[in-house]
C-alpha cells in the first residue's frame, strides 16, 4: 500500500534463518531493535523516492531518529507490518513517523528525519 507523498505500508517476514539470530540471543532469539528501525527507515526511503519526480536521480540520506520506543520483542515466525507516514517535507528535508506492528500489536515506533538529494550532489558531498 503506497500513497506517494503520504504513506506506505510494507511487510518483513522474520525467519529463524536470519543471520542475526545466531547471536541475538542464543536459545532466546529476538530481532535486534536497530534492525526494526532499519526496516522502518528502508520503508520510509521507499516512500520518499516514490514521492519524487525522477526518483532514479535521487538519494535518501537519513539524518536522525527521535522518540524510538520498543514495546514488544519480535521473534522468528513474526511478520512485521511497517506503517510509515510522511509528516513534513520542506526544502528536501523530511520528517516521517514509523510504526511496526505484529498481529495488530505495536512493537516499535520512531520518528525519522531524512534529506532527499540529487545523486550527483550526494556523491560529491
PLM features: what roles do these ranges have?
Residues 1, 8-13, 66, 111-116, ...:
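Small/polar/charged residue-enriched interaction surfaces, especially the RNA/DNA-contacting tracks
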Residues 1-31, 36:
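Catalytic strand-loop segment that frames the active site of acyl-thioester-processing enzymes
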Residues 12, 83-86:
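Short, hydrophobic/aromatic-enriched beta-strand segments in well-ordered soluble domains
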Residues 24-55:
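Helix-adjacent hinge/juxtasegments
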Residues 44-81, 107-109, 114-115:
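Hydrophobic beta-strand-centered segment that forms part of the acyl-chain substrate-binding groove
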Residues 75-78, 85-125:
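HotDog/MaoC-like acyl-thioester-processing domains
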